[in-house]
């Protein structure tokens, strides 16, 4: 007999840094998911990724308290900020894009860097080839105030 699906949830967790403290612990605990089991499984699956990179994760949980997780690649904005070399600013000490995209340019990247980002994100994008993926990432770059040269 198949497991009975109870629900699913989305979390963005830094790679290799899942721990029982907030926000991960309470979000899982109130749904009856074994927190330590999840943290160990997540950290094992993300050990090959860059540590600290935000990983969007879809967690599906079942009536018998078991779960499955689908870990996606970090957001395009993470790769773009890293490639552009944006420095952390503001209260939360995080890198930021332009306040008025289209009028203001905060940084620039090369088309080679754009291609590398598109190739890394290809598995999560609904693009048929790398050229289409590059156009999607280019749109994200423009909306952040990052110019693509070359």
UniProtKB/Swiss-Prot annotation:
<keyword id="KW-0488">Methylation</keyword>
<dbReference type="Pfam" id="PF03946">
    <property type="entry name" value="Ribosomal_L11_N"/>
</dbReference>
<dbReference type="InterPro" id="IPR006519">
    <property type="entry name" value="Ribosomal_uL11_bac-typ"/>
</dbReference>
<comment type="function">
    <text>Forms part of the ribosomal stalk which helps the ribosome interact with GTP-bound translation factors.</text>
</comment>
<dbReference type="InterPro" id="IPR036796">
    <property type="entry name" value="Ribosomal_uL11_N_sf"/>
</dbReference>
<keyword id="KW-0699">rRNA-binding</keyword>
<dbReference type="InterPro" id="IPR020783">
    <property type="entry name" value="Ribosomal_uL11_C"/>
</dbReference>
<dbReference type="Pfam" id="PF00298">
    <property type="entry name" value="Ribosomal_L11"/>
</dbReference>
<dbReference type="InterPro" id="IPR020784">
    <property type="entry name" value="Ribosomal_uL11_N"/>
</dbReference>
<dbReference type="GO" id="GO:0006412">
    <property type="term" value="P:translation"/>
</dbReference>
<dbReference type="GO" id="GO:0003735">
    <property type="term" value="F:structural constituent of ribosome"/>
</dbReference>
<keyword id="KW-0689">Ribosomal protein</keyword>
<keyword id="KW-0694">RNA-binding</keyword>
<comment type="subunit">
    <text>Part of the ribosomal stalk of the 50S ribosomal subunit. Interacts with L10 and the large rRNA to form the base of the stalk. L10 forms an elongated spine to which L12 dimers bind in a sequential fashion forming a multimeric L10(L12)X complex.</text>
</comment>
<dbReference type="InterPro" id="IPR020785">
    <property type="entry name" value="Ribosomal_uL11_CS"/>
</dbReference>
<dbReference type="GO" id="GO:0022625">
    <property type="term" value="C:cytosolic large ribosomal subunit"/>
</dbReference>
<dbReference type="InterPro" id="IPR000911">
    <property type="entry name" value="Ribosomal_uL11"/>
</dbReference>
<keyword id="KW-0687">Ribonucleoprotein</keyword>
<dbReference type="GO" id="GO:0070180">
    <property type="term" value="F:large ribosomal subunit rRNA binding"/>
</dbReference>
<protein>
    <recommendedName>
        <fullName>Large ribosomal subunit protein uL11</fullName>
    </recommendedName>
</protein>
<dbReference type="InterPro" id="IPR036769">
    <property type="entry name" value="Ribosomal_uL11_C_sf"/>
</dbReference>
<comment type="similarity">
    <text>Belongs to the universal ribosomal protein uL11 family.</text>
</comment>
């Amino acid at each position: 007999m198949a497991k009975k699906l109870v629900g699913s949830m989305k979390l963005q967790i830094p790679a290799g840094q899942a721990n029982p403290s907030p926000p991960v612990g309470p979000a899982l605990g109130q749904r009856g998911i074994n927190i330590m089991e999840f943290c160990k499984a997540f950290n094992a699956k993300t050990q090959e990724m860059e540590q600290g990179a935000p990983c969007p994760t879809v967690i599906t949980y079942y009536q018998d308290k078991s779960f499955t997780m689908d870990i996606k690649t970090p957001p395009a904005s993470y790769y773009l900020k890293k490639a552009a070399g944006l420095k952390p600013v503001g209260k939360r000490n995080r890198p930021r894009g332009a306040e008025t995209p289209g009028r203001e340019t905060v940084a620039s990247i090369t088309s080679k860097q754009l291609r590398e980002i598109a190739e890394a994100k290809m598995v999560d994008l609904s693009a048929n080839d790398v050229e289409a993926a590059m156009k999607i990432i280019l749109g994200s770059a423009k909306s952040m105030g990052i110019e693509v040269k070359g």
